[in-house]
Amino acid sequence: MSRTVCVTSVDGHTGFLVAELLLTNETFKSNIKSVTGLTLHPHAEKCKELAKLGVKIVPHEPGRLKHTVQTLQQVGAEALCLIPPAHKDKFDITMEMIEAAKQANIANVCFVSSAGCDLAERDKQPHLRSFIDLEAAFMASKGDSSTSTGHSPVVVRYPPPFLMSNFLKWQ
């Protein structure tokens, strides 16, 4: 069964890699009907590259919850890979996207968090620690029968790209 997948923050490193992988890896490609990329920067170079691969690039406009819900419904998103943007308003933008996923009744949502966020101290590393609050808000939908999103939410903690890049250089 092929799925329509929506990936957020495709203008960033992680979002770009996820969308690219879905359309280029044979294991995933055969199970994907289409990929939509939500982005704060639709004219970014990474968005142009993804568009060449077949990703439908859609601008994400924070503060317009109803519009975001409609967008998710219009593209027919059956699965959402929710990646917080590298943005000063990351927390608010992500909270709004969590709510949009619920209202759009997307049954399969994967929240991509940051490895090590549980070890961060709230006072010393507030940006990293905020991922814990976002994870909690996202997982609060689990078991919520008023939305399909409550069926199977999942959190994946991914190492920040710069850490992974540094790690690979030492190999």
What positions do the PLM features span?
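NAD(P)H-binding glycine-rich loop region in Rossmannoid oxidoreductase-like domains
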Residues: 37-104, 116-121
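Oxidoreductase cofactor-interface core, primarily capturing Rossmann-like NAD(P)-dependent enzymes
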Residues: 2-32, 38-45, 65, 86-88, ...
